[in-house]
């Protein structure tokens, strides 16, 4: 029943000068996996890692070549067997570690501010720009709804005020007109009932005409005020979006993918929207072209500048090692994964000169075939003694009921860091 369970351990292997490789170690029957087997596994992995990162593409890119990502490669050692493959670090195996300031109270939970990034076809897409487009569309819809609602509310309020003002003005106008009419009638026309009726009719006609003109003028003023309010709202929204973007870019705690367009942040929103729409259309066209031309090579991708782990850059590839039950009579030469000193090319990068793990080809090769032209050296004698002592130590060791990785991890800490 112990073979059913698995133990997953996440480690970081330091390679080159300033890089770290995420390792996902999946153990079957982990109770019998001891420290010696772990060290033996490390010596094999160093050659595989060196060969994989020989061209340097895996350090700064998430693109996996078909030969390295097609199937898992089985390798069998003296006691255990395992399969190995590489996978993109992001997004499935996300190792976006942030630089966090040291806290006074370590027991408090750590709050990490992060800027989301989206990888589409191995290309980085900034989620802030995409979210701005959606937010702008939503804001426009909300504005229209608010303007319609505000329009109804404002009309209701203004109608009451207008009625009161008009009533007051009509009363004052009536008084003025009555005073004028009385003065003119006293001088020219004698007072009589027919003249009073005519004057009353004239007064009513004048007040209605004035009301219609006033209503038209007020409606024009309302439209102007609404247009000014909409412009003010657009300006405020633009400022809020710009402030939000600058705060995220200026935050020292956040590690994000640096773009070359940092100087163009203060452009108008219309230009940004047009550019984003064009980019989205181009991305859709590129996706369609990639789907139609699956056999063709992909276009150039942006360099992978992922997270940091204790000041070291996390590589774009994650190594996945899964132990398997050893098959009787099945062997795979380890030398095909190991890069010998003779195979070194002059085009190799300088970063690999400072490879931390020891280059021990004699320890890795366990085949009995030896070339007759090769002479024995001190290295071969030391390896023979080391292998004999290792066999003696293995014969003395017995499987334990508990895993020794949790207790005896002194050798593990030399190569891996959790």
Swiss-Prot record:
Residues 123-174, 209-231, 258-302, 344-418 are annotated as: Disordered. Residues 136-154, 209-227 have a biased composition (Basic and acidic residues). Residues 156-170, 344-356 have a biased composition (Acidic residues). Residues 359-374 have a biased composition (Polar residues). Residues 266-293, 375-390 have a biased composition (Low complexity). Residues 391-401 have a biased composition (Basic residues). This is Putative uncharacterized protein DDB_G0288959.
């Amino acid at each position: 029943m112990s073979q059913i369970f698995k133990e997953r351990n996440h480690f970081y292997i330091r390679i080159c000068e300033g890089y770290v490789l995420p390792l996902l170690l999946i153990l079957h029957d982990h109770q019998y996996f001891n420290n010696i087997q772990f060290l033996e596994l490390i010596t094999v992995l160093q050659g595989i890692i060196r060969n994989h990162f020989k061209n340097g593409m895996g350090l700064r890119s998430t693109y996996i070549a078909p030969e390295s990502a097609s199937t898992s490669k089985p390798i069998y050692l003296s006691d255990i067997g395992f399969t190995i493959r590489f996978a993109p670090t992001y997004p499935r195996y996300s190792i976006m570690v942030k630089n966090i300031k040291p806290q006074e109270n370590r027991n408090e939970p750590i709050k990490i501010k992060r800027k989301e990034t989206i990888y589409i076809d191995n290309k980085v897409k900034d989620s802030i720009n995409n979210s701005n487009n959606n937010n702008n569309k939503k804001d426009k819809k909300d504005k229209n709804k608010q303007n319609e609602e505000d329009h109804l509310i404002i009309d209701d309020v203004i109608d009451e005020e207008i009625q009161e003002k008009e009533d007051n003005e009509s009363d004052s106008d009536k008084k003025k007109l009555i005073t004028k009419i009385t003065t003119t009638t006293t001088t020219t026309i004698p007072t009589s009932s027919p003249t009073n009726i005519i004057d009353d009719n004239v007064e009513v006609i004048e007040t209605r005409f004035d009301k219609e003109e006033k209503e038209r003028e007020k409606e024009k003023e309302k439209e102007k005020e609404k247009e000014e309010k909409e412009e003010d709202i657009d300006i405020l929204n633009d400022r809020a979006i710009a402030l939000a973007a600058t705060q995220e870019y200026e935050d020292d705690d956040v590690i994000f993918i640096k773009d070359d367009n940092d100087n163009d942040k203060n452009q108008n929103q219309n230009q940004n929207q047009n550019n984003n729409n064009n980019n989205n259309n181009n991305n859709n066209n590129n996706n369609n072209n990639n789907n139609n031309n699956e056999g063709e090579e992909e276009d150039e991708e942006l360099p992978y500048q992922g997270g940091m782990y204790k000041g070291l850059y996390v590589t774009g590839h994650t190594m996945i090692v899964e132990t398997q039950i050893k098959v009787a009579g099945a062997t795979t030469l380890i030398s095909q994964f190991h890069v010998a000193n003779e195979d070194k090319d002059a085009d190799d990068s300088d970063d690999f000169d400072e490879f931390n793990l020891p280059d021990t080809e004699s320890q890795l090769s366990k085949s009995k075939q030896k070339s007759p032209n090769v002479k024995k050296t001190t290295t071969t004698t030391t390896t023979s003694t080391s292998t004999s002592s290792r066999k003696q130590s293995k014969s003395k060791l017995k499987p334990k009921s508990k895993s020794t990785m949790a207790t005896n991890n002194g050798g593990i800490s030399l190569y891996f860091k959790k």
